[in-house]
Amino acid sequence: NIAGGLRVNDPAIDLAVLVAVLSSNMDLALDEKICITGEVGLSGEIRPINRLSQRIKEAEKLGFQRIIVPDGQDCDITGLNIEIVKVGRVTDAFRILFKK
């Protein structure tokens, strides 16, 4: 469950929620043009998700310039105006998102 009673059944939101909590805790703003997706395993690995290509296309339509996605998952997309950044672990995502 997400705060406020919103129920989420899609594990692809795991990484985005984790990053949002960390961002709030560290009082650091994220770039508003970054989309984040990925399931987070108990040991911090970012697991593959369903419908990745569809999610990337939709993120581009919504105006995102960059999307963080699970490493090791094929996304056979060309011709889009969005940077696809692959991460294998939570620490990789944090380094990319919170670099100074």
Task: Walk through the language-model features, giving the residues of each.
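Peripheral, non-AAA+ core regions of ATP-driven protein-machinery
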Residues: 1-100
